[in-house]
């Protein structure tokens, strides 16, 4: 237990990174996390820092999560810029960020997208940003990932046929 499970944490443009141990499934539980202001980052990384492969997953569980107005959250499972793979919430040897309590208030999903929360990765010189959903048993998961919601894609560079309930990228 690296951090007391009931310790409240307030982020004001800050970050939390949980590195799992190599060769083993790792877990950590934190108390109530409040996103007070600014751009915040929470990462759960399987394997040792600097490792390009992971054996074992890393599950970071938040007792609850609250987001104040003017605060946002980037959830990631990689902190290495040379790995272009957003595997957050995937089954297997990857990072997961879970919330014990329900996502309420301004974090309550709208069309299955969690407002104010996104996932990003660095991919060959460009930043790729995805909307995020919450999947029971997997936690935060970027849209478009296997087993998650998909983006509406009619083909080409158009929004033809999109409705107010479609998620368009």
Tell where the protein language model's regions lie, with residue ranges.
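Beta-strand repeat architectures
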Residues: 1-169
């Amino acid at each position: 237990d690296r951090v007391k499970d009931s310790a409240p944490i307030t982020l004001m443009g800050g970050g939390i990174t949980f590195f799992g141990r190599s060769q083993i499934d790792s877990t950590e539980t934190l108390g109530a996390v409040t996103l007070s202001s600014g751009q915040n980052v929470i990462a759960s990384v399987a394997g040792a820092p600097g490792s390009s492969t992971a054996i074992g997953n890393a599950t970071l569980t938040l007792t609850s999560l609250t987001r104040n107005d003017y605060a946002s959250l980037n959830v990631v499972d990689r902190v290495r810029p040379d790995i272009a793979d957003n595997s957050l919430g995937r089954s297997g040897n990857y990072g997961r960020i879970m919330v014990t309590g329900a996502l309420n208030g301004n974090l309550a999903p709208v069309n299955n997208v969690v407002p104010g929360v996104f996932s990003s990765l660095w991919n060959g010189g460009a930043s790729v940003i995805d909307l995020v959903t919450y999947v029971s048993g997997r936690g935060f998961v970027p849209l478009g990932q296997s087993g998650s919601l998909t983006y509406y894609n009619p083909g080409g560079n158009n929004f033809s046929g999109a409705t107010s309930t479609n998620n368009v990228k």
